[in-house]
């Protein structure tokens, strides 16, 4: 929005030309989202406490979590607000990729909000019925995927980028819609499952978003895209603004979510952030890269699948409790140790993922 205004004002003062630089807008996008999160934090926490929107804690969970009961939740609202405002201010409003991300972000945020509302207000521990949650998540994911397929049919925008292999980018055709669906819905749920400890989900989200900011910049630059043998996508550059907004909003939220947390993001935050990372990976044609950089989310999800599958097939559990972060808690690891070690692993995976762009 401000970019368009600056384009009209540059004729009167050349200094407004700085708004045309992607690097400048990326930095101010991050700072804008960060400051909005920091400003909203105390006000949001006080409001949630006044409304008694407190966290519901399972009775069969680790005993250390019982003290978290009543901690304000639904703090993801401030994350979504910070991201949306920052993106609308600093990204080109005419960019279709930006609107794709905002559609998934806000759509999944609404689904998460309804889920949280049922849990904390109606005291329904199950929240939104699972089939309805997946139905609406699927509607949004399939709608966006179908629109992208129609817009990018038989172009690099619907090719599959395979890591480690130079110029191996098969055209997916209709399989693009199916892949996009699973990536968006799967990542939304994966981040949701990871959000079980103070700050555990938000920092890997920040790391992955930062990694995708670099990938988006390279993908939107023809010279670097050709150098790295990845598809050049002319709309991809503006995703840098979206990614840096996620980084800023995430760091601002972490200020209040770090152990011991003053607020939790709730499903309104985790589903939205996961869906946003998923659609960004789809837009950049880097679904495989998301699996590497978001390895923490993948392992958390696999631990639940393996736990449920093992119990149904063999009547035995593999882990003491799933997702796997609870397994380490029950082994005696202090919560901060689990969190920080998962952060370190996440950072390593993001760096490894970025390195694969050159190893071809």
Swiss-Prot record:
It catalyses: UDP-N-acetyl-alpha-D-muramoyl-L-alanyl-gamma-D-glutamyl-meso-2,6-diaminopimeloyl-D-alanyl-D-alanine + di-trans,octa-cis-undecaprenyl phosphate = di-trans,octa-cis-undecaprenyl diphospho-N-acetyl-alpha-D-muramoyl-L-alanyl-D-glutamyl-meso-2,6-diaminopimeloyl-D-alanyl-D-alanine + UMP. One of its GO terms (molecular function) is phospho-N-acetylmuramoyl-pentapeptide-transferase activity. Its main location: membrane. The keyword Cell division applies. The keyword ATP-binding does not apply. One of its GO terms (cellular component) is plasma membrane. Catalyzes the initial step of the lipid cycle reactions in the biosynthesis of the cell wall peptidoglycan: transfers peptidoglycan precursor phospho-MurNAc-pentapeptide from UDP-MurNAc-pentapeptide onto the lipid carrier undecaprenyl phosphate, yielding undecaprenyl-pyrophosphoryl-MurNAc-pentapeptide, known as lipid I. It comes from the Bacteria. Pathway: Cell wall biogenesis; peptidoglycan biosynthesis. It comes from Klebsiella pneumoniae (strain 342). This is Phospho-N-acetylmuramoyl-pentapeptide-transferase. Its cofactor is Mg(2+). Belongs to the glycosyltransferase 4 family. MraY subfamily. The chain crosses the membrane at residues 26-46, 72-92, 94-114, 132-152, 168-188, 199-219, 236-256, 263-283, 288-308, 338-358. It is a multi-pass membrane protein. HAMAP family: MraY (MF_00038). CDD domains: GT_MraY. Keywords: Cell cycle, Cell division, Cell inner membrane, Cell membrane, Cell shape, Cell wall biogenesis/degradation, Magnesium, Membrane, Metal-binding, Peptidoglycan synthesis, Transferase, Transmembrane, Transmembrane helix. Its EC number is 2.7.8.13. It is an enzyme of class 2 (transferase). It is found in: Cell inner membrane. GO terms for biological process: cell division; cell wall organization; peptidoglycan biosynthetic process; regulation of cell shape. InterPro entries: Glycosyl_transferase_4, PNAcMuramoyl-5peptid_Trfase, PNAcMuramoyl-5peptid_Trfase_CS. The gene is mraY.
């Amino acid at each position: 929005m401000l970019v368009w205004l600056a384009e009209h004002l540059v004729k009167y003062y050349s200094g407004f030309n700085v708004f045309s630089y992607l690097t400048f807008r990326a930095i101010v996008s991050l700072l804008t989202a960060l400051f909005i999160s920091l400003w909203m934090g105390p006000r949001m926490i006080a409001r949630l406490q006044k409304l008694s929107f407190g966290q519901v804690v399972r009775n069969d969970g680790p005993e250390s979590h019982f003290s978290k009961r009543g901690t304000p939740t639904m703090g993801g609202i401030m994350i979504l607000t910070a991201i949306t405002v920052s993106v609308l201010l600093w990204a080109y409003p005419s960019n279709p990729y930006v609107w794709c991300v905002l559609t998934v972000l806000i759509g999944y945020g609404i689904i998460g909000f309804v889920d949280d509302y049922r849990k904390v207000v109606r005291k329904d521990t199950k929240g939104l019925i699972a089939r309805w949650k997946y139905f609406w998540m699927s509607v949004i994911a399939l709608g966006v995927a179908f629109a992208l397929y129609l817009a990018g049919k038989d172009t690099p925008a619907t090719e599959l980028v395979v890591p480690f292999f130079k110029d191996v980018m098969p055209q997916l055709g209709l399989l693009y819609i199916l892949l996009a669906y699973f990536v968006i819905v799967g990542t939304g749920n994966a981040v949701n499952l990871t959000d079980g400890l103070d700050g555990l989900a938000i920092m890997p989200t920040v790391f992955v978003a930062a990694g995708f900011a670099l990938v988006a910049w390279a993908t939107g630059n023809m010279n670097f895209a050709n150098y790295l043998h990845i598809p050049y996508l002319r709309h991809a550059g503006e995703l840098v603004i979206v990614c840096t907004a996620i980084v800023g909003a995430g760091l601002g939220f972490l200020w209040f979510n770090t152990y011991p947390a003053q607020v939790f993001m709730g499903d309104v935050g985790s589903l939205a952030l996961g869906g946003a990372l998923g659609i960004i990976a789809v837009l950049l044609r880097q679904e495989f890269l998301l699996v590497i950089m978001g390895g923490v989310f993948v392992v958390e999800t696999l631990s639940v699948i393996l736990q449920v599958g093992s119990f149904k097939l063999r009547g035995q559990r593999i882990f003491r409790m799933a997702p796997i972060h609870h397994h380490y808690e029950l082994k005696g690891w202090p919560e901060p140790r689990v969190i920080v070690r998962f952060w370190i692993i996440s950072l390593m995976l993001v760096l490894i993922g970025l390195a694969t762009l050159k190893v071809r």
